Design a protein with these regions (language model features):
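Hydrophobic face of amphipathic alpha-helices that form TPR/SEL1-like repeat modules
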Residues: 1-27
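Short, well-ordered beta-strand elements within core beta-sheets of diverse protein domains
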Residues: 31-38, 53-59, 145, 254-257, ...
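Residue-level signal for inorganic ion chemistry
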Residues: 29, 65, 87, 109, ...
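ALDH superfamily catalytic-core signature
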Residues: 228-369, 432
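Conserved C-terminal structural/oligomerization subdomain of aldehyde/semialdehyde dehydrogenase
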Residues: 26-34, 218, 255, 309, ...
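Glycine-rich loop-to-alpha-helix module at the N-terminal edge of alpha/beta enzyme cores
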Residues: 30-119
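Structural signal for hydrophobic packing residues in well-ordered secondary-structure cores
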Residues: 51-54, 58, 73-80, 84, ...
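Rossmann-like NAD(P) dinucleotide-binding subdomain of oxidoreductase/dehydrogenase enzymes
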Residues: 77, 121-264, 389
Length: 474
């Protein structure tokens, strides 16, 4: 069994205690690694190291910070096979998908490095003669980055790269479900030659995470996680009025218009719902189909969902992999059972398979209602509830009648329909004739309970800055 060490102040170090967190492969349930259970003292030492390093890091010309990030991206790309192998074991992804995630993480790191010369301020006219107003962009300081289990490599760089180019230093807490890939990333950090303390990576329990996030030197907490995790982070932020950046839950609606290419739409929706067993915050979570094409579209969905086979992707990469844990599977199965009890029709799936691994079949439910739990709450699994509508206004109303507003999808061939939905949908993203993909030059930000702030692009990078107004009298 491999054993990892925390990465703090430029060194791989043993934790203060001899406690470890065991990591298992969700496809086999076999333990394969153990990672340190950092103590509050370990977390505070990491923040102290980051705070000390930030004083010099922030004063480096941004082009020099970019040079570090480019070397980091080179190291990530070179280490993609090792990062991918670790990620495949801890997540149940195929080695190819996991390695591609590492390569993509290198790409987003390069993208943010290229912002070095474009972190711009403003010159604002003054109302007073002989006076100028300068608005400057400055780093926040130490950023605590809390990483989810579903895309732990990409999401780590999605937060760390913009934080670093803006002049911040970081303390990263990976998910305890998928931490081993983070320590492979730590090796890439080391190979890139960052100054000690600029990047720190530690695994820990919730109590230690609280000590990390409430340290007075932490100026920002960046989380991708559940709504409940977001509420907890807001509590942490209260201690020192730290800035929150929260990418939280989603319940992506897909609206299928009568003129849509039904075959194309069905294939895309099933791929979205079964990629990584539906464990994506932007996966299709509810489908609204026009009455006139409902039966045809459901038949297409049923055939495609029934054809999806679950299994260990290390043995067969064409299969759908496992959920993250037994608890996640029990939660999802309970939601399906309650939906059927409330009147939904189970078209395919909906049973827990025998044998090892946290697998769950692609599951299609029809005759669902807007008030059902399966429509109102995030499943985060391969379950697709389908509802009918008769008018576009009704479909938009259903889509917007929700606590979440992260992403949304529309299939139509009519420009007027697309623009009507684009101007009315209550979500941070709308994808027309495709499913969500989060381009890193865009801005991934949710409405309502889906979050505060956002990731990606110019606006995602600026999340990691604060402003200073200089009023210059001459």
């Amino acid at each position: 069994m491999r054993t990892e060490r925390n990465y703090v102040n430029g060194r791989f170090v043993a934790p203060e205690s001899d406690a470890f967190i065991v990591v298992s492969n969700p496809a086999t349930e076999a333990p394969f690694a153990r990672v340190p259970a950092a103590t509050p003292a370990d977390a505070l030492a990491a923040v102290d190291a980051a705070a000390a390093a930030q004083k010099a890091w922030r004063t480096l010309p941004s082009a020099e910070r970019a040079a570090y990030l480019h070397r980091f991206a080179d190291a990530l790309t070179a280490r993609a096979p090792q990062i991918g192998a670790a990620l495949a074991q801890e997540s149940g992804k195929s080695v190819e998908d996991a390695s591609n995630e590492a390569v993509y993480a290198g790409q987003i790191t390069r993208y943010h490095a290229e912002w070095a010369r474009r972190i711009e301020g403003e010159i604002i006219p003054s109302d007073t003669p002989d006076e100028n107003l300068f608005l400057q962009r400055e780093p926040i300081g130490v950023v605590a980055c809390l990483i989810p289990f579903n895309y732990p490599v990409y999401t780590l760089l999605r937060k760390v790269a913009p934080a670093l180019i803006a002049g911040n230093t970081v303390v990263v807490r990976p998910s305890n479900h998928t931490p081993v890939s983070a320590f492979e990333i730590a090796k890439a950090v080391d190979e890139a030659g960052f100054p000690p303390g600029v990047v720190n990576i530690l695994t820990m329990d919730h109590a230690t995470a609280e000590a990390l996030c409430t340290h007075p030197a932490v100026g920002m907490i960046a989380l991708t996680g559940s709504v409940n995790a977001g509420r907890k982070v807001l509590d942490y932020c209260k201690a020192n009025i730290a800035k929150p950046s929260l990418e939280l839950g989603g319940k992506t609606p897909a609206i299928i218009e009568p003129d849509a290419d039904l075959e194309r739409a069905a294939a895309a929706l099933v791929a979205s719902k079964t990629t990584h067993c539906g464990q994506l915050c932007t996966a299709i979570e509810r489908v609204y189909v026009h009455d006139s094409v409902h039966d045809r579209f459901v038949a297409l969905l049923k055939d495609k969902m029934a054809a999806v086979r679950s299994g260990d992707r290390a043995q067969d990469a064409t299969r759908m992999g496992p959920l993250v844990s037994a608890a996640a599977r029990a939660h999802i199965h309970g939601m399906v059972e309650r939906a059927v009890a409330a009147g939904a029709t189970l078209e395919t799936g909906g049973t827990i398979p025998d044998g090892p691994g946290f697998f769950y079949p692609a599951t299609l439910l029809t005759n669902c209602r807007q008030d059902m739990e399966i429509v109102q709450e995030e499943t985060f699994g391969p379950v697709m509830p389908v509802l009918r509508y008769t008018t576009l206004d009704e479909a938009i109303g259903f889509a917007n009648d929700h606590q979440f507003g992260l992403s949304s999808v529309l299939y139509t061939e009519r420009y007027r329909t697309a623009m009507t939905v684009a101007n009315a949908i209550e979500a941070g993203e709308l994808y027309v004739n495709r499913t969500p993909a989060d381009p890193y030059q865009g801005f991934h930000a949710g409405w309502k309970r889906s979050g505060l702030g956002g990731d990606d692009g110019k606006h995602g990078m600026l999340e990691f800055t604060q402003t200073r107004l200089v009023v210059m009298k001459y």
